[in-house]
Amino acid sequence: MVERGPTVYLSGLREKHFGELFLNAYNVSESSSATQASSSQAASSELGLSEEGLKHIARYIEYFESRYNDIWLVFHHEGVSLSKLMYTVEEAEISSEKAEEASHGQILRPSKWWTWLKTTESGKEEMRRIIWQLLLGLKACHDRNITHRDIKPENMVICLEDIKSGRCLKGVPNGDQNFKTNMRIIDFGSALDEYTIKHLYGSTGPSRAEQTHDYAPPEAILNSSWHHGPTSLTLKYDMWSVGVVMLEMILGSPNVFEISSVTRALLDQHIRGWSENFKELAYKLRSLMEMCILIPGSSLKHGGASSKQGGISLASWKCSEEFFAEQIKSRDPLKIGFPNVWALRLVRGLLQWYPEDRVTVDEALQHPYFQPPPSS
C-alpha cells in the first residue's frame, strides 16, 4: 500500500506505470517467443537473449485505489532481498555519558551465506550469477530507455527456488538441497523515462530525494539537473550502482566508500566550519580519490598526477590495478578481495567518474568476467 501525500502518491503512480509497462512487455515477449519457436530457431534464440531480462524484473499484478485515495500495488512474492541474505543483524548497546540514556542499536555483520559466497567455488559462481541476472534486468530497462535510479541490495530480491517444489526456500539452503537462483529488481518508484519525467514527477521534476546517496554516481550527487543530458548518459547512473553493489558483495559491508578515522581526522582540520552535508561530500570525494576514481590535480581523461594541499598528500599513491586490488583485499574481513582480475576490471569499468567512460549494460554482459556465461 502507498499512503497518501503528493510525493509518495506520485512514487506509487510511477510504480504502476513501470509495472504495467513491463507486464505488457513480458506478455508480448512470451507471445513472440511462441511464434518464433515455430518458424525460426535462430530468431527465437535472438529474441530470447534480448528479452531474458524481463524475467529479472518484479512481476506486477494489479493496481487499485481505495475510497480514501490510498494506492494499492500488488506484486508477486519474489523471495528475500540480497541485503537480508548478505547480513545478519546483531543487537548492540550504545553507551552514553548518562547510564539512563543508554540505548540499543543494531549492527550488520556478514552472514554465513556471504562467507560461502566468498570462500567456495560454488559461491563465487553464485556471485557471478547474481550480477549477471542484475545486468540482464537492467538491459530490459535500458533497452526501453528506463533508468532505475535505485539499484542496491535492498532492491534485489532473490528466490532460491527449490527444484522439486518450485517454491522459494526459507532461509539459507543446506548442502543437501537442490535449488536454482533467480534475482528480480524491485522498486521502480525512483525510475526515469521520458513519460515519468514529464508527467509523474510534479512541477519540480526528479530530485536527490528519490536517490540513495551511497549508490548514486558523482554526477547525480554534484549536479541536480544531471538527468537533462542524453538518455545514453542518464542510463549510466545504474551502471555506477552495479559497481557499488559488486564492491559491497566483495567487502561484505554497505560502507563501500568509507575513509579511515585517521584520514577523517586529518581532513577535518581543513573543513572546520563546513555544514554537515558538505563534510559528508568531502569524505565521499576523499574515498573516491583513494579508490582512484577521482584523481585530483588533473583531468581523468589525461592521466593522473598527485597533488598536495596544506602539507597533506591528497593522492600520493599509484592508481594501478595492483594498488586497487590490495586496497580492497585489506578491507575485506576475510582478506580475500576480488575473486579474480576480471571482477576487478569490471568494477573499475563500472566505477568511472565520467558517465561516458562507464561501460554500458551490453558491454558489461560481454565482459570476460562472464565468460562463459553463468548457468541458470
From Swiss-Prot:
GO molecular function: ATP binding; protein serine/threonine kinase activity
Gene Ontology annotations for the cellular component aspect, listed alphabetically: nucleus
Cited SMART domains: S_TKc (SM00220)
Single GO biological process annotation from the record: mitotic DNA damage checkpoint signaling
InterPro entries tied to this protein: Kinase-like_dom_sf (IPR011009), Prot_kinase_dom (IPR000719), Ser/Thr_kinase_AS (IPR008271)
Protein kinase domain span: 1-370
Pfam families: Pkinase (PF00069)
Organism domain of life: Eukaryota
Annotated family: Belongs to the protein kinase superfamily. Ser/Thr protein kinase family.
Record's comment describing the protein's domains: The protein kinase domain is predicted to be catalytically inactive.
Record protein name field: Probable inactive protein kinase At3g63330
